[in-house]
Design a protein with these regions (language model features):
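A Zn2+-metalloprotease active-site environment signal
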Residues: 19-284
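N-terminal intrinsically disordered, acidic low-complexity segments at the extreme N-terminus
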Residues: 1-24
Length: 284
């Protein structure tokens, strides 16, 4: 009849409903029951299966369908941001840049993308210091500080750039981006709306969960550097000597760190040396 009854005495209403056998269905569902523990366990098992099988599959699909225009947009935006915030124009003489570029092109020609698949850029690293990195579209950046650290060792410089070729060839940066996004989405799906602070914590957790893939990618890029350098008739162990130089000049710890995205330098040098021996034995 359109009547509306309101009361603040919730306990009395519950007692009346219980007395007349009309306790609400929703209320019963909200009460604690051992089956809730089984449900929670099932949710976590399901999430684990998604992380183990679905996320990697979706990452591969995403990488496969990403058009070149997207990777070019990502690379140009990233480099533009770094140029504004960190980098400055290289102070390396043009003759030295040309010398390095020519040596790099000889190695890049042996890769699956060829010379035309890469664009080598020189920058002063500023706060970043000695470094080199690759962007998804084949844009490579090497800093003056890294070239200075190599102290005239061309094989060391080209070995580092061959390592970056490995990252591009295997599309590591795209995979890492999509994997981190997938893990973050999975965590947020389970946790729900946890607010800005909680979201930061959870997405940081997603990044940590992806670090093992980063270490695998670094090892794979090291192996590609060894193989390309050997094909080009250069020192296949040059990338390992670069890590030794880093350890010597910058005092980096030679042991592996669990939260590091790169394997420890001692561990990497040993793996590089082992792979170089295998490549040399296979070519002899």
């Amino acid at each position: 009849d359109g009547s509306l009854f309101e009361t603040e005495d919730n306990d009395a209403v519950d007692l009346w409903l219980k007395k007349h056998g009309k306790s609400g269905f929703v209320h019963e569902l909200e009460r604690f029951h051992p089956r809730l523990l089984a449900f929670v366990a099932a949710v976590f098992v399901f999430a684990g299966l998604i992380y183990r099988f679905a996320v990697p599959a979706l990452v591969e699909v995403a990488v496969l369908v990403t058009p070149p225009a997207v990777t070019q947009w990502m690379a140009s935006g990233t480099l533009l941001s770094l140029d504004k915030a960190v980098f400055s124009e290289s102070a390396l003489p043009e003759e030295r840049q040309t010398e390095i570029r020519d040596a790099f092109n000889q190695v890049a020609a042996l890769s699956s993308r060829g010379v035309g698949g890469y664009n080598l850029n020189f920058r002063q690293g500023g706060a970043i210091g000695p470094n080199a990195f690759a962007l998804p579209d084949g844009t490579l950046v090497i800093t003056d500080e890294l070239i200075e650290l190599a102290d005239g060792d061309m094989d060391m410089i080209i070995g580092v750039l061959a390592h970056e070729i490995g990252h591009v060839e295997q599309e590591h940066s795209l995979r890492q981006l999509y994997r981190a996004a997938g893990v973050a989405g999975l965590i947020m799906l389970i946790a729900g709306d946890v607010g800005a602070a909680g979201e930061d914590i959870l997405t940081s957790g997603a990044a940590l969960m992806s670090l093992s893939h980063s270490r695998d990618a670094e090892n794979e890029a090291d192996r590609i550097s060894v193989e390309l350098m050997a094909k080009a008739g250069r020192d296949p162990r040059a990338i390992g000597r670069f890590f030794a130089r880093l350890e010597e000049k910058l005092g980096l710890d030679g042991d592996s760190s669990f939260l590091s995205t790169h394997p420890g330098t001692a561990e990497r040098r040993q793996a590089i040396d082992d792979h170089a021996r295998a490549v040399e034995a296979g070519g002899s």
